Amino acid sequence: SVSDSVQVSQAPDSMSVSASTPALEVLRSGLLTTFQDDGRVAANMGVTGSGAADRTSSHLANALVGNPANTPVLEITGGGVRMRAIGSVVVAVTGASADVTITGSRQSQDSQGGSNGTFTPNSPGGCSGRTVLNASNDAADRTTIAMQQPVLLRDGDVLSIAPPTSGLRDYVAVRGGFGVATTLGSAATDTMSGIGPRPIAAKQRLAIRTASTACDAGVGLPQPWPTDLPKPGRPTDLYVRLGPRDDWFTAAGLSAFLTQTWTVTAQSNRVGLRLSGAAPVERTDTRELASEATPSGAIEVPTSGQPVIFLRDQPVTGGYPVIAVLEPESLDVAGQLPPGACVRFHVVSAHATSTPQPAYPTKEVR
């Protein structure tokens, strides 16, 4: 395995949880929940970068609770997660659009902070003012909260994240960060090689580090959605730069790649998205290709002619020609594509030019 070849020493997944350590106790772990950050730099050891599939959303979650951007977060694929707060915890949920609720004695807690819907710092105890922004009570002990905002969970509160209505992955950041060990400089779980912490399971207690400053310092305000989330029934536009092996394909093959709508198949995960289309991408060069480096966002075309988009857990090398590479912002969007989603590719032109361009959709980079 990769971990054997580089002799990686796996540290314990997280710091121990004492009675006085704030934590999140996992009641339901969902389809796949992992620790992620910005990933590791270890390609020279044959190890992929890994990290958050939607880095924009993970950075936003950390910003909302006042953490550095690279602080480990929880990446939740497909929702269905429930976690109980042990002690007071400031959290933020970003990413895929989903119903997020808090169950606990919220009405009496909210009354301490007034009724103007604002987060009140510097109240007695440091963070004991208004606990929820833009919340609505739909039951005596259940509160529905808007995403993309800091929220205070009190001891015993249960945070629930439902399956997404658009997008695929949600991110949970906690003020101070999770007390998770790093491997090769990162706390990211690499699902292909097994490097990093194991996927989160029910009954785990996830320790939370103490924030270095007062809990209200640097906590952000509610933010708009950072990316255009994939929506059912509407094709998602992904922007690419052609190459380095686009010359291995026929003109008809390039046209098929760029003009038809592709569907994300169920054989997709954090490693990559397998696509299906009516017209396969035809190759003009049928030789075997020596293994080459494959970055996240590379789009390989195997002999079937059905493209594969590599995501964050991609292999460091691949043996099929790469027809194009996603732009960084499109890589984050691709990380939110669920099975069944439809995508279209658009070529990015680096500069405006009078030279005739291919008759494909383009986006000019300024």
Regions flagged by a language model, labelled:
Residues 1-366:
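Conserved "landmark" site that anchors the functional core of diverse proteins
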